[in-house]
């Protein structure tokens, strides 16, 4: 059963954009893809549903017990070649200053490998400090790879080498492209129906991913998820 979690360093780092792009990439490859969102957020799930043309869902460890979460995930996996779980907020953010209800909590309950999205805008060497902090914050972070968002091709080689030395797999980068931005507002993302030229933007994101992400590496991590 192939699955991955796409988690981030915080809200606004590009999780939903990257999940939508990956869903489109996998669809283009002929893979039956399903998606789930950590927490009760229904707006991001609407984005997933629009790309995949199917109903998606949520995994919420605040409202559901562990067995229910495992059941909801297994139900999606049974009908898919690959399942993508989108994280919520920052990876370790849960109730207050605890991890209950966090993406990390869901990854632990379901034993799902995690790919961390790092928004690299305004950073260079500090990228390494951020990643080292996230991968070392808990004994087993479940983080198996990193995608660098808003990073130039010029900086990627050094960033990738830095991550490799930490024992984490660099899985590519995405440069900033204005035409691929999914709009947001003060209280978060607009709904998918409010995004102008939504499918064109998702197609643009997926096209960029095919050039600068290690899609095979992402699939390999997903395939190594425990059954």
Question: What do the predicted segments below correspond to?
Answer:
Residues 114-117, 171-173:
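Short hydrophobic alpha-helical runs that function as membrane-insertion/retention elements
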Residues 125-227:
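Internal gly/pro-rich beta-alpha loop/helix module
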Residues 2-13, 17, 23-110, 118-145, ...:
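ATP-dependent carboxylate-amine ligase catalytic core
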Residues 1-2, 227:
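Intrinsic structural disorder
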